[in-house]
């Protein structure tokens, strides 16, 4: 059913031009609407009168008047938005492929008479906002508490909020299983879970890091344990609907991987001094090949930190995007008023459930991979492998 606007006999013959005063009435609320197109947050009105939902048969598609009206609609949208690109998008969203002259004329008249507050313009915002919705919107960082300090801008975002929630949950969990927090000799379910994770990471450190006594290995254990639990809880928290996946952002995973890798490099220098650079040149390498191998090993060593962060970011972002896409597809089919669409949606729905289970496994696996690679890199720095 094609949407059209109410029109009368006078509006069909109207040749009035756009009122430039409408463009000057665009305020900050409209500007905020335009900036929200990509996130699907554009607001709009849905009038209750029947005119906008009426159907009108098309006229001659070769009529030059159709082309004139379509161009006029685009020009009016450009004038209202003061943005040629956005005006083109809104204009095409309104007239689409319609060849209905009264329909197009009513749109042009509404834009002329009512400007940005009119039914036509608000309908364009709705159409563009719905079309611009993206599976990547779930990764948008939204400022919750903006803060300005001089020329610097700081803000407490949704990413900061969920990182604090993760750390708070982690600290409370650790506190409640200690003696001061009420831990029992006979462990309860939470205490058993924490002890299981503790033993798992402890065994990982003992197996992967060689050349050190047990007491020295204990120096690195707290950092590795906290890193593993932080990543594990961040990944699992991202599976909760309407939450935020902290590890789906490259800057966060990159900052974590580089900070840890710099610490590992410092440990290597503390243990070996300048002899630490000897890992760049394996023993027995011919002298002519030495410069190339040193450069190659140096690039390989530096890219360890980059790959460590990219691996986590890419896996979490790709998995969540795929679940979002298939969920939207299944939901659209379920909302169709047709039994065949409903039955056809069962397939994507089962795939979404399977992918959700797979994402839970990926969330745990990526925390494990990140942790074991830290242990391997630390072992290489200590033993110069």
Swiss-Prot record:
Highest taxon above the source species: Eukaryota
Q: Report the subcellular localization.
A: Mitochondrion inner membrane
Q: Which UniProt keywords apply?
A: ATP synthesis, CF(0), Hydrogen ion transport, Ion transport, Membrane, Mitochondrion, Mitochondrion inner membrane, Transmembrane, Transmembrane helix, Transport
Q: What is the protein's major site of localization?
A: mitochondrion
MF terms from GO for this chain are:
proton transmembrane transporter activity
Tell me, which GO biological process terms does this entry list? Answer: proton motive force-driven ATP synthesis
Database matches in InterPro entries? ATP_synth_F0_asu, ATP_synth_F0_asu_AS, ATP_synth_F0_asu_bact/mt, F0_ATP_A_sf
Topology class, membrane? Multi-pass membrane protein
Return the GO cellular component terms, semicolon-separated: mitochondrial inner membrane; proton-transporting ATP synthase complex
**Transmembrane residue ranges:** 154-174, 220-240, 249-269, 276-296, 316-336, 339-359, 362-382
Propeptide positions in the record are 1-133
Q: Which HAMAP family match?
A: ATP_synth_a_bact
The record describes the protein's role as:
Mitochondrial membrane ATP synthase (F(1)F(0) ATP synthase or Complex V) produces ATP from ADP in the presence of a proton gradient across the membrane which is generated by electron transport complexes of the respiratory chain. F-type ATPases consist of two structural domains, F(1) - containing the extramembraneous catalytic core and F(0) - containing the membrane proton channel, linked together by a central stalk and a peripheral stalk. During catalysis, ATP synthesis in the catalytic domain of F(1) is coupled via a rotary mechanism of the central stalk subunits to proton translocation.
Task: Give the multimer and partner information.
Answer: F-type ATPases have 2 components, CF(1) - the catalytic core - and CF(0) - the membrane proton channel. CF(1) has five subunits: alpha(3), beta(3), gamma(1), delta(1), epsilon(1). CF(0) has three main subunits: a, b and c.
Q: What else is known?
A: The atp6 gene is located on the border of one of the mitochondrial DNA repeats resulting in two identical copies of the mature protein with different propeptide extensions. A stretch of 270 kb of the mitochondrial genome is duplicated within the centromere of chromosome 2 resulting in the duplication of the gene. The expression of this duplicated gene (At2g07741) is not demonstrated. It is also probably not RNA edited and therefore differs in all the positions known to be edited.
The entry's family comment says:
Belongs to the ATPase A chain family.
Q: What is this protein called?
A: ATP synthase subunit a-1
Source organism (scientific name): Arabidopsis thaliana
- Whichever gene encodes this chain, its name is ATP6-1
């Amino acid at each position: 059913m094609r949407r059209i606007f109410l029109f009368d006999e006078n509006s069909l013959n109207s040749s009035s031009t756009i009122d430039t005063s409408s463009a000057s009435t665009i305020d900050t609320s409209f500007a905020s609407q335009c900036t929200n197109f990509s996130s699907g947050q554009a607001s709009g009105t849905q009038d209750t009168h029947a005119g906008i939902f009426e159907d009108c048969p098309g006229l001659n598609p070769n009529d030059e008047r159709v082309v004139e009206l379509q161009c006029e609609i685009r020009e009016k949208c450009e004038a209202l938005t003061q943005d040629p690109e956005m005006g083109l998008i809104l204009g095409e969203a309104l007239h689409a492929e319609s060849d209905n002259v009264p329909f197009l004329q009513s749109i042009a008249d509404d834009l002329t008479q009512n400007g940005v507050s009119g039914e036509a313009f608000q309908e364009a915002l709705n159409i563009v906002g719905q079309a611009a919705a993206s599976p990547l919107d779930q990764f948008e960082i939204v400022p919750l508490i903006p803060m300005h300090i001089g020329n610097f801008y700081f803000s407490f975002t949704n990413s900061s909020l969920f990182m604090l929630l993760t750390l708070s949950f982690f600290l409370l969990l650790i506190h409640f299983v200690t003696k001061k927090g009420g831990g029992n000799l006979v462990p309860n379910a939470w205490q058993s879970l924490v002890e299981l994770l503790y033993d798992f990471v402890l065994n990982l450190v003992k197996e992967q890091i060689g050349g050190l006594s047990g007491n020295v290995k204990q120096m690195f254990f707290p950092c590795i344990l906290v890193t593993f639990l932080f990543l594990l809880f961040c990944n699992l928290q991202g599976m909760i609907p309407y939450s935020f996946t902290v590890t789906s952002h490259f800057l966060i995973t990159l900052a974590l991987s580089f900070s840890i890798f710099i610490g590992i490099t410092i440990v290597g220098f503390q243990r070996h001094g300048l002899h630490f650079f000897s890992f760049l040149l394996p023993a027995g390498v011919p002298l002519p090949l030495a410069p190339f191998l040193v450069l190659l090993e140096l690039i390989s060593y530096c890219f360890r930190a980059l790959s460590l962060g990219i691996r986590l970011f890419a896996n979490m972002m790709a998995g969540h995007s795929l679940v979002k896409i298939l969920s939207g597809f299944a939901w659209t089919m379920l909302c169709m008023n047709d039994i065949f669409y409903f039955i056809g949606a069962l397939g994507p729905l089962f795939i979404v459930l399977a992918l959700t289970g797979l994402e839970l496994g990926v969330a745990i696996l990526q925390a494990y991979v990140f942790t074991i690679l830290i242990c391997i890199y630390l072992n290489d720095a200590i033993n110069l492998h």
